[in-house]
Amino acid sequence: MTTMVSVRVLGISGSPRKGRNTEHLLRAALEAASKVEGVETELLRLSDYRVLPCDGCNLCVKKEGCPLDEEDDMGELKERLQEADAVIIAAPSYFSSVPGILKNLMDRSRPLKMGGHLLSGKVISALSVSALRSGGGEAVVEEILRFGLTHGMIVVGGCGDPLTQSWSGIGTLQGDAGWRRTSDDGIALRDSRGVGRRVAEVALTLKRGRL
């Protein structure tokens, strides 16, 4: 009898704004992931949590944990990251970088690395939104993926049509006829779905022990 394998894909919206452009792309990716048999998805908004900035105390290096966990919600977020088999992080471009709330999460995740690479082997991918076509979307994706590589995670991109589809979903609000929402950016939505589907497939393959 074949044992049913299931994986959990956690989508993290790193935008301070709820239900807006970044979340549209993330929902598209998670919807595509959920259509892969054996995959459960969950959307988490960082804007619902309080995460203080790292103060560089280095107690995590000494394996003493982070004292700030007692003052904010980072302890819960670390648990959610560890429970997931795969993570898709979506963020808008703020001056060609990630928003402060997401950077706080990245910096404060250091105890997970110092505690024994607790996120290693998990799948990660990234989505982004920028206002201008050259507004820093790719820089945001690269920053998120560097975060994953620092934790020893497995970076995955979409594998759609090699001539027309990108490996990542990057939305832009600047269209040919003026401004738009990502819900009207068909290319970004399509590419985001491709990312979600591929993340789900790779996470399942890894859990089944085929890689």
Positions of predicted regions on the chain:
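N-terminal beta1-alpha1-beta2 submodule of the flavodoxin-like/Rossmannoid cofactor-binding fold
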Residues: 1-118, 164-211
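Short, glycine-/small-residue-rich phosphate/pyrophosphate-handling segment
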Residues: 100, 118-163
